[in-house]
């Protein structure tokens, strides 16, 4: 919404500049999008009166005029405007004037005739051109007065974004009310006098819909619809972005911008019988003021007479009942329409009007009478007429109810986070137009004003208190509270575990806890399956001791259907009945199981498929364990269904939590499977998360030493590495195996293992003697324990 700053300051004029006023409005929640001057700077332009007009002796399109500017001799000015005539008044740029664009006026000659200035059109003083030619000023414009002063061009247009909840601010009055509150000033409202009825003519109004709780109308006869709109009204409307039309339209638009009340004038002669406020009849048609014909539905409210619809209520009038130059008598409307009765209807017809915008957001239901009196006053002053009595039709039970809201000091302090003085709360709400009553217990009972539809709960009142206090005045303070350190999350959630496995390319399988007894026996020949007394089918007759009993049939099913790469996992229960003497002793162990068959990666254009090996599969299991920060060790597995050289038992603190590896080749043959990788992990152990300890990184250089050992090939590498780490002590930072060699130069039954040893001290540089001593000690211990010898280079 655009408004004139000068117009606003006639209502309330705080002692602040334009920029500060703009900032105030923004902080009040009325965001200023733009603050633009009405006209660019210029000087030396005054009101002039054209005394004579003669034809230029040497140019058909030029005239030689004499112009009175109120001082000294009349000026001779050559002018080419088609509308120049004797007796008219227009802006005159005198010698030395500087117009917008730094255009300087000098004495000169046009086709041989001296010109002592320039008669100006609107565009030459940075105003909008309405006609081709000079800007014609009213006959009563005082000659010689500075045009900026006369047209009040030292003004700004304030463009404000009104939020949907602040329909009360769609007017000068609404904005002025906010400025007055924040600056603790009184508004200078114009004196609105009621216009007494001079005739008895009136129109009966019948409301037959719930969408119009209050409707006012007035008959005005013998109106001069051709009366000129005064310059001050034209300028006010222009600076609000509204074009002038005729005196009646301009008056209703002026009241709309001034008070926020939409109004409409009908040609009285075109109304047949009673005025009805009703719902449209199905397929009823209406030609609107914009010449658009619309077909109405019964959820659209209309103003009608006994024969036809005259207007879409609250949106736009109809062409058939509009005021024309031949109109003498009018019926003036001012009404309160319920927001829900208007909302969405304008958009349905592709319309967006000032009236619908205001009615949709809520117009003050007490405003129609004030607006009717204001419009009557202006029409009487500017266009004359005889006024009938104001007709009021009302359904008072449908008017908005002003319910009291209870507000406690503690609620204000708690919601805002700082203490607000009780006196300020009462004063701020009172200045906003609320009726505030202080109860015996100090609690406030607050009745919002009729124009504030957005005040419904106590939080709304607190928001208003903060807004008036100033959001930029909210005190900065750290909250004080009693806190307890949150307990460390020591569980790796199942959902996270599931997501981790899915990310590795596995698909989840959900199966029965029963299995094929034959497969159970194949997987673990040493244990007899626990059979069900009444199985649901012959292939689900045993309680599964391993989830592989369920996953392997899934793999077989998919491989038999041309799936070359199969990867499944299951989170389920397995039954540990090896040590159970009875059903009561039977343990159900939550377990994560993995099965993978096929290539390491899916088939792709950029690389040939590579078969998965033990280390690929072990890496995936390690990634699952790493997600839960489980610290594990790997030792050779002795499980009979696993490949003896490509499997590992997984230990935590020396206790097995599962295994990983390849199925035994003989079992793969029995089950008609290619290379199949499997793993089972105790779910409870995987979900147990371990706290990571902080260790400061050493700033001092590390030293690497390598040793190659000839050692029996039946000694576990893990045992050798653990012995090296134990013997190396605190100075040995880390060690790893980087080479294994058998063949020429290494006797049968032995292999060469090469280890890297990284030495580092946390707080100083190590000396060679310390490292040599540590290396010698490790070599001696390995020789004594495993009969290891250093391999010659």
Where does each model-flagged region fall?
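Phosphate-backbone binding interfaces of nucleic-acid-interacting proteins
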Residues: 1-195, 331, 350, 354, ...
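A carboxyl-terminal module marker
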Residues: 2, 20, 27, 431-434, ...
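Glycine/proline-enriched, intrinsically flexible loops and inter-domain linkers
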Residues: 5, 23, 28, 63, ...
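Beta-rich nucleic-acid/ligand-interaction surfaces
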Residues: 39-43, 196, 482-488, 511-528, ...
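Conserved mixed alpha/beta core segments that line enzyme active sites in large multi-domain catalysts
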Residues: 47-76, 234-235, 252-320
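Mobile "lid/hinge" segments at catalytic clefts and subdomain interfaces of large enzymes
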Residues: 111-124, 131-136, 148-149, 156, ...
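Extended, well-folded interaction surfaces typified by the phenylalanyl-tRNA synthetase beta subunit core
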Residues: 174, 405-409, 413-566, 705, ...
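Terminal amphipathic helices with adjacent charged low-complexity linkers/tails
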Residues: 181-207, 383-412, 419
């Amino acid at each position: 919404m655009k408004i004139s700053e000068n117009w606003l300051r006639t209502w309330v004029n705080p002692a602040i500049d334009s920029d500060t006023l703009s900032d105030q409005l923004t902080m009040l929640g009325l965001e200023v999008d733009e603050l633009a001057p009405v006209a660019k700077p210029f000087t030396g332009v005054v009101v002039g009166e054209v005394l004579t007009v003669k034809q230029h002796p040497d140019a058909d399109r030029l005239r030689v005029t004499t112009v009175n500017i109120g001082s000294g001799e009349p000026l001779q000015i050559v002018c080419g405007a088609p509308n120049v005539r004797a007796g008219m008044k227009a802006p005159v740029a005198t010698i030395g004037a500087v117009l917008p664009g730094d255009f300087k006026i000098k004495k000169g000659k046009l086709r041989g005739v001296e010109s002592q200035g320039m008669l100006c059109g609107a565009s030459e003083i940075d105003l909008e051109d309405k006609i081709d030619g000079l800007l014609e000023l009213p006959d009563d414009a005082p000659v010689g007065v500075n045009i900026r002063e006369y047209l009040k061009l030292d003004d700004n247009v304030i463009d404000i974004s009104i939020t949907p909840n602040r329909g009360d601010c769609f007017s000068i009055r609404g904005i002025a009310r906010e400025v007055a509150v924040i600056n603790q000033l009184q508004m200078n409202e114009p004196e609105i006098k009621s216009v007494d009825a001079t005739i008895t003519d009136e129109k009966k109004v019948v409301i037959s819909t719930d969408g119009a709780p209050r409707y006012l109308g007035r008959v005005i006869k013998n109106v001069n619809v051709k009366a000129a709109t005064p310059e001050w009204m034209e300028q006010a409307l222009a600076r609000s972005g509204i074009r002038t039309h005729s005196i009646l339209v301009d008056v209703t638009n002026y009241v709309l911008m001034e008070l926020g009340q939409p109004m409409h004038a009908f040609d009285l002669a075109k109304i047949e019988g009673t005025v009805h406020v009703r719902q449209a009849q199905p397929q009823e048609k209406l030609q609107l003021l914009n010449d658009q014909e619309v077909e109405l539905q019964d959820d659209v409210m209309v103003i009608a007479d006994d024969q036809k619809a005259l207007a879409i209520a609250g949106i736009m009038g109809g062409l058939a009942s509009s005021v024309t130059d031949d109109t003498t008598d009018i019926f003036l409307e001012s009404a309160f329409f319920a927001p829900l009765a208007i909302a969405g209807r304008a958009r349905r017809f592709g319309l967006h009007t000032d009236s619908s915008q205001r009615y949709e957001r809520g117009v003050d239901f007490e405003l129609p009478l004030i607006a009717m009196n204001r419009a009557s006053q202006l029409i009487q002053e500017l266009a004359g007429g005889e006024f009938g009595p104001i007709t009021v039709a009302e359904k008072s039970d449908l008017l908005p109810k002003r319910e009291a809201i209870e507000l406690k000091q503690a609620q204000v302090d708690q919601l805002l986070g700082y203490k607000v003085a009780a006196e300020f709360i009462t004063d701020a709400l009172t200045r906003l137009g609320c009726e505030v009553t202080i109860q015996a217990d100090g609690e406030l009972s607050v009745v919002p004003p009729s124009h504030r539809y957005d005040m419904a709960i106590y939080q709304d009142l607190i928001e208003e208190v903060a807004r008036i206090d100033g959001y930029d005045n909210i005190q900065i303070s750290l909250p004080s509270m009693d806190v307890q350190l949150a307990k460390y999350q020591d569980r790796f959630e199942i959902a996270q575990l599931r997501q981790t496995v899915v990310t590795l390319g596995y698909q989840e399988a959900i199966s029965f806890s029963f299995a094929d007894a034959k497969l159970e026996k194949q997987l673990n020949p040493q244990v007899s399956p626990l059979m069900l007394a009444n199985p649901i089918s012959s292939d689900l007759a045993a309680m599964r001791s391993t989830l592989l009993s369920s996953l392997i049939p899934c793999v077989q099913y998919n491989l038999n259907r041309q799936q070359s790469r199969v990867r499944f996992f299951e989170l389920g229960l397995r039954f540990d009945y090896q040590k159970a003497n009875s059903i009561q002793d039977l343990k159900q162990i939550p377990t994560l199981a993995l099965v993978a068959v096929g290539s390491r990666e899916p088939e792709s254009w950029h690389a040939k498929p590579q078969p998965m090996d033990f280390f690929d599969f072990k890496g995936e299991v390690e990634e699952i364990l790493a997600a839960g920060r489980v610290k594990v060790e790997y030792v050779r597995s002795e499980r009979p269904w696993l490949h003896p050289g490509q499997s590992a038992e997984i230990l935590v603190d020396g206790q097995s939590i599962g295994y990983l590896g390849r199925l035994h080749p003989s079992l793969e043959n029995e089950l008609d499977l290619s290379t199949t990788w499997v793993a089972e992990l105790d779910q409870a152990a995987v979900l147990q998360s371990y706290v990571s300890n902080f260790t400061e990184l050493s700033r001092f250089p590390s030293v690497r030493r390598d040793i190659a050992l000839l050692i029996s090939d039946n000694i576990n590498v893990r045992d050798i590495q653990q012995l090296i780490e134990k013997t190396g002590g605190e100075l040995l930072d880390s060690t790893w195996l980087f080479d294994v060699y058998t063949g020429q130069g290494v006797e049968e039954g032995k292999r060469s293992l090469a280890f890297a040893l990284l030495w580092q001290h946390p707080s100083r540089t190590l000396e060679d003697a310390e490292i040599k001593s540590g290396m010698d000690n490790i070599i001696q211990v390995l020789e004594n324990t495993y009969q290891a010898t250093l391999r010659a280079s």
